[in-house]
Amino acid sequence: MWMAAVAGALVLIVGLFAYHRYSLQQTEKKYPPDGEFVTVEGVKLHYISKGEGKTVVFLHGGILTGNDFRDAIDLAAEQGYRAIAFDRPGYGYSERPKNKRVTPRDQVRLIHGALRQLGVQKPVLVGHSWSGTMTLAYALDYPDEVSGVVLLAGAMYKEGYPAERGDLISQLVTNPVIGDLFLHTVIRSPLGAALTKLTLTHTFAPEPIPEGYREATLAFWLRPGQFKANREDVLAFVPAAKEASKRYREIRIPLIIMVGENDPFGTKEQAHRLKREVPHAKLKVIPGVGHMIPQNHPELVMRALGALSE
């Protein structure tokens, strides 16, 4: 009896693994890379670049890719900017450094190296959600190489961050044995689809999920490498924010803090705190808007960019 049960379990695991491989191949066919690549420290990074003029660099949050900013990229290019959006390391078609836990400052260093290779000088940095702390860390590490920062619903402090008191899913996924089995058999199953639906509904609330976004999330976020990168980032955020926030008062460059009045993640409170610590920053709280500003309100991204020069 037990041998039959073991055999059945093995067949199920092999079947799920094969389905995952097939599903990943279909994702790459449906959503091929639409940008270019640059290699930094042996890590290949994918980016989109459009337009000519002053450079704006967009850094996405924790679910999808640089394409989160696709509408803002189009608007920026139309309005005379050179718009660059990276897939952060491990997301989209960007590689992630192997055999180490990647910190936000590791990602800062890689993005900085990529921009130097691309000949970018003194860009404006735009960071959304999780990238709030990373964007500020970049400005603190390279203060003479950034002309301004825009934070969109940014997470900047460990206090109030969802994983501040621990995150069981992230702990499971980043376990070297159980995590790999989960990622290569379960994550693209109906369980993963249910998790995606729950996550997106909460993340976009109280606003609608844009057409096609759910499908793209199922395709990209539920890839083993990207989901693991996301959960590593969740765990890395708390110590990174704790360290970076000690230096926020040192920020001297122009800074715009934009947050939705109805953001469900507590970023409004973080925005007010950052404004107190960086008095010259401009704080803009937008009525009726939630967390996903780049996806639902690209025109607000442009308004924030314009406010840098006001």
PLM regions and their residue ranges:
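Short beta-strand/loop motif that positions the catalytic acidic residue
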Residues: I251, I257-V259
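Acidic catalytic loop of the alpha/beta-hydrolase fold
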Residues: A236, E261-G266, H291
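Conserved alpha/beta-hydrolase catalytic His-Asp/Glu region
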Residues: Q26, Y161-A163, T185-E250
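Conserved HGGG/HGGXW glycine-rich cap/lid loop of the alpha/beta-hydrolase fold
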Residues: S49-Y93
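Flexible "cap/lid" loop of the alpha/beta hydrolase fold
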Residues: V150-T185
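Active-site loop/oxyanion-hole signature of alpha/beta-hydrolase fold enzymes
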Residues: V40-G42, I48-K50, A85-V126, R303
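Conserved hydrolase catalytic core segment
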Residues: Q121-E164
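Catalytic active-site module of serine/aspartate enzymes centered on a nucleophile-bearing elbow/loop
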Residues: H280-E310
